[in-house]
Amino acid sequence: MPTPTKGPRLGGGPAHEKLILANLATALFEHRSITTTEAKAKRLRPHAEKLISFAKKGDLASRRQVMKTIRDKSVVHFLFTEIGPAMAERNGGYTRIVKIGPRKGDNAPMAVIQLVMEPVSAKQGVVREAERAAAVSAPAADEVVVGDEAPAAESTDAAQVEAGGVEQPDTLPDADAPATADEGVEVDAAEVDPSDEKKDQA
């Protein structure tokens, strides 16, 4: 017994499903964007991306594989000459599905499936590198958290001082220390002054 495909079953049987997907892919490559139900769009996406991968290869065997699915030679030509080279820099993700409102008649969920024809920018590579760097620096962020815990300990000491649990000295040693050092330097300079020594001798 053959294994059924993943996702919803389209049409009456397997042959009908293949025809539906082939027609949807043909319309997608011809118009670059089509509106269909969400279920059909989700089933079409891997099928269309596989055909685009064949178009990126561009050899005769790939063209024959695509011709098995898409019977319109003009669409195959457009796929191999326009769409395939435009997707050369992109590694997957050739299509995009955008959900739109439900259909008026039967309230079926609708979606627009379209080809992603925008060129791959250098910014996308930079964003990927930044994400990798952020993942690598995640352990470094843990070290920063340890540094943040120290001010919290200092704040608890300040709270104890305010509560009267710890005695606080009357003078600040940092404020007095530079003044004492300056006075000591002046005193040493006065003691070494040779004019004072001559006056003392006379």
Curated annotation (Swiss-Prot):
Q: Which SUPFAM superfamilies match?
A: Prokaryotic ribosomal protein L17 (SSF64263)
Where are the compositionally biased (Low complexity) regions? 169-182
Give the record's GO biological process terms. Answer: translation
Under InterPro entries, the record lists: Ribosomal_bL17 (IPR000456), Ribosomal_bL17_sf (IPR036373)
Swiss-Prot/TrEMBL keywords: Ribonucleoprotein, Ribosomal protein
How does it associate, per the subunit comment?
Answer: Part of the 50S ribosomal subunit. Contacts protein L32.
**What family name appears in the similarity comment?**
Belongs to the bacterial ribosomal protein bL17 family.
Q: What is this protein called?
A: Large ribosomal subunit protein bL17
Lineage runs:
Bacteria, Bacillati, Actinomycetota, Actinomycetes, Kineosporiales
